[in-house]
Amino acid sequence: MTDEIDKAPHIPVLLGAILREVAPVSGVWLDGTFGAGGYARGLLEGGADTVIGVDRDPLAFEMAADWAGSYGDALRLKEGTFSNLDTLADEPLDGVALDLGVSSMQLDLAERGFSFMRDGPLDMRMGQIGVSAEDLVNDAPEKLLADILFQYGEERAARRIAKAIVAERLKCRINSTLQLAGIVEKCLPSKKPGQSHPATRSFQAIRIAVNDEFGQLAQGLMAAERALRPGGKLAVVTFHSSEDRIVKKFMSERSSTGGGGSRYAPEAAAKVPGFTLTPRKAIPPDADEIARNTRARSAKLRIATRTDAPAQPVAPETLGLPQLEGF
C-alpha cells in the first residue's frame, strides 16, 4: 500500500497563488485538509511560524511520519475534521487553508473505493467510520438515491441511474467500484474524446453524501470565521461548482452589510461584515499549472480577510445546501 502511494504525484493545487495573494505568510496557520502535506509544507517554507495540520484520515499522518519530524514543533498534526477547526487551535489563527479536493493518495488506493478507474471495495469514507458507499448504494430508497445523484452530482440522468442501481441490487449486492461504475455507464451515452468518465458525477455525489462534505464545509467556514484573528486569511480551493457556490455564498454573505431592503418594510439592522474579499473574484489555475497537474483544471481559489467584527452563523438555506428528505 505504501509503495503504491509513494509512486503517485502529490501536487498541491493553487498553492503558489495562495502564497502570492496572502503574502507575507507569517504566524500560525491551520491546514484543514492536510492530506499529503503539500499545503502545510508550502506554508512553512513560505514563512509561516507554525502550521496545524488537520485531517480525518489517519493514513495522512501515517504517510507524513517520514518527513513531519524535520519541522519540529513548527508542524502540529491533529486528527479531526475542519468543521470544528476553531476547537483545534489554542490561539487565534493568522490563516486557514482548505483544499476541498479528494487527496491523490485516497484516489490512488483502490481499497479506499473512491475511484471508478480501479476496482476496489465500494467504501469512499474519508475517516473510515460511519456509513460506507456500499451501505448507501444498497440500502437507500430509490428516490433518495436519485436526489443525491442530482443534488450532489448535478447528474441529469439521476432517476435513470437510481432505478438501474435498485434493479441491480435486487440481483446481488453492489460492493465494488467497477461494479457501480458499470451500472452507471450503461445508463449514459458512451464517452466522447475529451469528456470525463460517465461515472464521474455519480461517484462525486455518493462520496459527498457519505462524508457529509457540504455540511462539513458550511460548518468549517463558520469555524474559520470564529478562529481567525482580525487580518487573518481564509483561503479555500474548490473543485466543482456545487462546493464553489457554497464558498462563494458564504464569503458574499459575510462580507456584505446587507441590501437596501424595502421602504415599506421595517428597517433591518445593518450586518457587520466578518470578512473582506481579497480579491473579490475567484482565482483559477494558469495554463502552466494545468499542464503540470491535470487535476487542477477545474479548481478555483477564493480568499477572504477577517475583520474585527464578531463571528456570526449563516443559515444552511442561505448557503444553498441541498435539503434531502430522509437523509
Swiss-Prot record:
- In the UniProt record, the gene name given for this protein reads rsmH
A Gene Ontology annotation in the biological process aspect, one of them, is: rRNA base methylation
Binding sites annotated in the UniProt record for S-adenosyl-L-methionine: G37, G38, Y39, D55, F82, D99, Q106
One GO molecular-function annotation for this sequence?
rRNA (cytosine-N4-)-methyltransferase activity
Q: Does the keyword Transcription apply?
A: no
**Known CDD domains for this protein?**
AdoMet_MTases
Q: Where in the cell is it found?
A: Cytoplasm
Say which enzyme class the record assigns.
transferase
User: Per the record's keyword annotation, is Iron included, yes or no?
Assistant: no
> What is the name attached to this protein's record?
Ribosomal RNA small subunit methyltransferase H
Which species is listed as the source?
Jannaschia sp. (strain CCS1)
Give the reaction(s) catalysed. cytidine(1402) in 16S rRNA + S-adenosyl-L-methionine = N(4)-methylcytidine(1402) in 16S rRNA + S-adenosyl-L-homocysteine + H(+)
Key words of the record: Cytoplasm, Methyltransferase, rRNA processing, S-adenosyl-L-methionine, Transferase
Q: Which family does it belong to?
A: Belongs to the methyltransferase superfamily. RsmH family.
Instruction: Note the PANTHER family from the entry.
Output: 12S RRNA N4-METHYLCYTIDINE METHYLTRANSFERASE (PTHR11265:SF0), S-ADENOSYL-METHYLTRANSFERASE MRAW (PTHR11265)
Which EC number(s) are documented for this chain? 2.1.1.199
Q: What does this protein do?
A: Specifically methylates the N4 position of cytidine in position 1402 (C1402) of 16S rRNA.
Ranges for region Disordered: 303-327
What cellular component terms from Gene Ontology apply here?
Answer: cytoplasm
